[in-house]
Amino acid sequence: MLDANRIQQHESAAHEKRNWIRLTAQCNNRCTFCLDSDAHNGTNISPMTIKAQIIDGKKQGATRLILSGGEPTIHPNYVEFIALGRRMNYRRVQTVTNGRMFSYKPFLDKCLDAGLQEITFSVHGPNAKIHDALVGVRGAFDQEVQGIINSLEDGRPIVNIDIVINRMNVKYLTQMMDMFIEIGVKEFDLLQIIPFGRAFHEGLASLFYDFEEHADYIQAALAYSKRPDLHVWVNRMPPPYMEGFETLIQDPYKLNDEVRGRKEEYDELLAHGTALSCKDPERCRRCYLDLLCGQLDRTIEGLQEHSFETLRADKPIKKAPYDDSKRAWAVAKNVIEAAQIAATLPGAELILECDDYSGLAIDLVDGVETALVAGKRVVRADAKTPAAIDQLLALGGNFEIAVHLTQATAAHLHEHHNPAPARLAFTISNYELVTDNWANDIYLPAFFGTYDAAGAVREGIPACQGGKTPRRRPSVFDARMLGEDGKLDIFGYAHRYIEESYYTKSRRCRDCVHDLECEGVHINFVRSHGYAPLMPVLAADEDAGPVAAVA
């Protein structure tokens, strides 16, 4: 596993705000896997448009400028764009290129003198035969290698290499990496081929490969990440095939970039119901966005059919997407703010998620002790801190207390509330950053193996971790997915998908008796702790206790 400093470096880099600008709609290669080929029309973007984007990106807070294409180096104003990026004080000016133009040293010198700081070369074969066949130009490999050598010998730019993994090169990944390591390259980005552009239209049979059959080749390449002198990144690779190298799984934050690249189509889908042009079963099953798009379809359908039983919000909303939901869910700092939110939401029942429950009172309604907020009956309150646990238990009442298990709450329960009080249920939080997982997560089998919670509900905790079949998480529509116009917004949706729905399982989970109903765990749980804790339950005895992870 990578050390903590390396992981934090990767996480900071993934979350850096970038201004990715396409300079051209043309290329001097014709890659068989080009995902942008449908947008190529043989033109360059106007210099004024590009310069405006460079300036605007900096105003919007971007710190890294990435000049891309098509092929960016063939734009006649390429050097000007580099210079403008430096004048705008971007922390880093980077380009992604096929590198052929950098085989001409005078051109490279002009670019570096203008302020180009990082060059990402796209190389796809260990030799001219494979590379040139993939990029469609004889001699391209020799030119690109010369460009890499020129850049390394100059010493000024950071040099790294992108490799699009496909059927023609997957068996040669380590050979390619060895060759470029030998001449001084220290950073590689391994990109899984995706079914867009020519990759789908022309390369479906020749470029896509079976993961099971080629897993050993992928694992061998990932093993280079163990070397302290190298940086290895992986993009769009199905996470289950990265077991043993889970810290290399693409940061889920980068899904926002994937969505941004198809924003216009997503907007058409949400505004007018226009199906995505890429919608095709053969394509979708090979696409890294398949789960995100599938959940989006279900979200749209749920809104249309009013099938979400719970509507959640973290601020008062002007208009609910529909007014017949059963339950409201208010996320707030305190009960006063929660009441203001709840008053704008439909539903007779209420879930509270507050940092501080001071002021929450119990009323006697029809002879039953009940908490009422904004006229709604509280059926559940989430507790994320020891203080919240104590506040809620002291109140009495008949609502459920859903404790989010963290290092702090687990220790508090062991010391002050063991065995588990009758109203407690247990769940776990998802985190945006791996470093937050490290700071908060507990080893669940150890907790449930030592804490007396036999009768307590587990929600969203796999049976192998909690020792019994969990209750599924409630069906929730989160109002944070809505734009200012009150309609579903693709970036709001993507953010909530990453936080709430981006779950994964180990390949061995297929053998578990709970596989069909189990959601798995959040992607950042796996990026933090690996797939090792996920061990299939092979007997239907739910009370056998949590399954210990392999050593």
Locations of regions flagged by a protein language model:
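Accessory C-terminal segments flanking Radical SAM cores
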Residues: 196-311, 417-547, 551
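Radical SAM/AdoMet-radical enzyme domain recognition
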Residues: 51-66, 75-192, 339-416, 423-425
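Short acidic/His/Gly/Ser-rich catalytic and metal-binding motifs that mark active-site loops
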Residues: 30-33, 130, 196-201
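Short Fe-S-cluster ligation motifs
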Residues: 56-74, 308-328, 534-551
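Short glycine-enriched, charge-decorated loop/helix-capping segments at active-site entrances
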Residues: 36-44, 133-139, 204-209
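N-terminal [4Fe-4S]-dependent radical SAM core
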Residues: 1-21, 255-274, 290, 310-336, ...
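Canonical Radical SAM [4Fe-4S] cluster-binding loop centered on the CxxxCxxC motif
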Residues: 11-49, 290-293, 297
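Soluble or luminal CAZymes and related metallo-dependent hydrolases
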Residues: 45-49, 139-143, 168, 172, ...
